[in-house]
Amino acid sequence: NSNGSYTRAPIVDTSKLNTIDENGKLITTAIYNHTKKPVEVAKNDIVVYMIRVYNEGSLDGYASEIKDHLPPYLEYVNGEFNDKYGWKVSEDGRTVTTRYLEKSLIEKTTTDNNGKIILSYKEVPIMCKVTSNAQGKITNIADVTECRDENKQVIVDRDSKEDNVVLPSDEELPSYKDDEKGDYIPGQEDDDDFDKVVVKKFDLALRKFITNISDKDVT
């Protein structure tokens, strides 16, 4: 959007955070409402994903390492944009890792004058390209693989394990979580998430939450 906001960014609902559910368990995760409907793309399109990390806890901390797991038909774009954010590509080109946020403190939760819990966050973008032979739905999964407390000491997240995401097979990726409906579709834990694009079935020129497709904001 012209004001710098993203139409696919989550609307955060913290009304149940840190309350007790019907089973007597503490609710440790906010609700993040945002569409997971695949964005239409064409072959060779450039896609920018924004990876945003929220702090839902009572301690300041750092998302020291983040990994993005690239699916078939989506490739990393070498160049100044991704270099700025410290992305490093694995030998097979399927996993990209950054420590860009390791010095960016994500502050603990606060409460406003009305008692509403407010979450702080930090974010890092990654630029990818839809391959020339792409087809169908393309699912991109990212997760936090290392977190540290305000003193830079390794810390255990209260409701998720680092580097614990189970990646679907390439055959299963296109339909990943398609059976889950609604505005809030959580990841496997609260430190991973996904987004999808779908290649248009009609091709003229045919040239992962998503903020920009080939220099045009997603609406």
Regions found by a protein language model. Name each.
Residues 1-219:
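Exported/extracytosolic protein signature
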